[in-house]
Every structure is written in C-alpha cells, then in structure tokens.
C-alpha cells in the first residue's frame, strides 16, 4: 500500500480569496515570502498568492527537492539551471525558463545546497 506522502503530489494552498488551490509540486519553481502572504511561482504568468506563511508551506514540501535558500525563498532544485556568482562571496540560483529568475542564496545556506547537489 502506498503512503499518503507518495500519493499526494500536490501542495494545498489557501488563497487570499478563501479558495483552496492544489498545485502540482513539479510545477513549482519557487516560493517567496511577501508582506502577509506567500507568492508561489509556476509557469503561469500570474503567481499564486497564499495567506499561509513561508515557514508553514515549507513543512509540506518534500526535502531535498525543495530547499530554503534564503529567509524569503524556497526553491525547487529540480527547476534550477545554474549557480551563478554575484560579487566575490555571494551566489544566486538561476531558474529554468520560462521563469528565468535569479534567486539569492544566503551565505549560511550555501554549504547545505552544495551538499544536496553533490558538489
């Protein structure tokens, strides 16, 4: 018998309008903490908005595919195209198209991300 974790491949998200969205985990590029809400970016142009805080959603995301690389961001490592330097000591995660966003990596998280990626 399959476990519930193996069966459920969607993230339930409470929308700001009171709706409940079920977002496929593979479709998520990143989550970003906002002021009083969280943005969830997928391929669609308009991000999902959730009333749930980033740390609440983080508990429901499978590790190590989803990693909190910065206090304001959780990234799906399956959607990362490259790690790029930003200055002498800082790094960004560059995401796949169509998002093509650069997400900062906190210095204290860089070693953990290297380990997850096997670097």
Predicted regions and their residues:
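Basic, polyanion-interacting recognition surfaces, primarily
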Residues: 2-119
């Amino acid at each position: 018998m399959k476990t519930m974790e193996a069966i459920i491949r969607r993230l339930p998200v409470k929308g700001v309008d009171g709706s409940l969205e079920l977002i496929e985990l593979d479709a998520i590029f990143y989550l970003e903490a906002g002021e009083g809400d969280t943005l969830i970016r997928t391929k669609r142009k308009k991000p999902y908005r959730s009333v749930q805080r980033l740390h609440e959603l983080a508990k429901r995301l499978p590790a190590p595919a989803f990693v909190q690389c910065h206090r304001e961001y959780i990234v799906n490592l399956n959607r990362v195209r490259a790690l790029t330097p930003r200055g002498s000591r800082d790094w960004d995660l560059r995401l796949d198209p169509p998002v093509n966003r650069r997400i900062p990596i906190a210095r204290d998280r860089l070693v953990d991300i290297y380990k997850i990626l096997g670097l």
